[in-house]
Amino acid sequence: MALAAASILFAPAQQQQKVIGFMTDFDVKDDAVGICKAVMDGVAPGVRVIDITHQSEPYNIAMGARFLAGSAPYFPKDAVFVVVIDPGVGSTRKAIIARSRVGQTFVLPDNGLLTLVQDRDGIVEAHEITNPAWMIGSGISSTFHGRDIFSPAGAHAARGDDWTQAGSVLDVSKLVRLDLHNATINTTGLHGQVIGTDGPFGNLVLNVPAETFAQLGYKLDDEVPIDLAGKHYAFPFVKTFSDVPVGKELFYIDSRGRLSLGINQRNFSETYKVGEGADLTIPKK
């Protein structure tokens, strides 16, 4: 799924240490996130860590890839990202550090989390993290690489250490990629998919960029028919939730420039029992 070119990138951080964007699926009910941040501070005292989220759906690499690509443009051009959504922890999957064409650095498992960043920004160089000096030390856990590998490596990069010393160079064309794609249009209309829900609100996020939806010919206030998860509906296309009464459905373009489905002050996903992975078709007008 391609994303629009990043255009919101801020200037490099003014302090010597770089900002770290930290994202996991750990939740915050136990001490895992705090431990990782303590490790970062131990390597790079006073480092500024911005929590992107720690409630990405467990094991959902595609969701993590979407959150990472969506948040990266709002960080400095020299920011470091530590991302731990790692169902393959302790296996043969690689721990990597990579640099985008923009200049941002990513420390994460090689499991597809970089797919959308690579599509939009390009990855110019990547290394496997094998240098013990970039890890927590001896006794690396087989189940907590967030603490033992990714956090210290990210902190080393943030404090300005030469990130190419983290380990052996990798062929960026062979980094693991997810099969993420945008909706397609043919003679019968648009064919797409639900790629997630919008936090606790239950709005459906679709793999339909605004410019793709525009090709169907619908205008604001049009009723848009849709076959969703095998059932047929029609909802108005409007600018925002308040354009329809409370409890009524709507199509709208979300803050990331994607077509979405919602209900004003209600949860669409729960109401219609539809979630990530559901197929959809929208005919041309």
Where are the language model's segments positioned?
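N-terminal signal-anchor module of multipass membrane proteins
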Residues: G21-V28
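A short aromatic-anchored loop/beta-hairpin motif
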Residues: D51-T53
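Active-site histidine-anchored catalytic micro-motif
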Residues: Q17-V19, D31, V43-V49, Y59-R66, ...
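A conserved acidic, glycine/proline-rich C-terminal tail/linker
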Residues: V205-T271
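Pepsin/retropepsin-fold aspartyl endopeptidases
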Residues: Q265-K285
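Bacterial Sec-dependent signal peptides at the C-terminal "C-region" and cleavage site
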Residues: L3-Q16
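Anionic-ligand-binding alpha/beta catalytic cores of soluble enzymes and soluble regulatory domains
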Residues: G139-P209, A214-Y218
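Short, solvent-exposed amphipathic alpha-helices that sit
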Residues: A32-M40
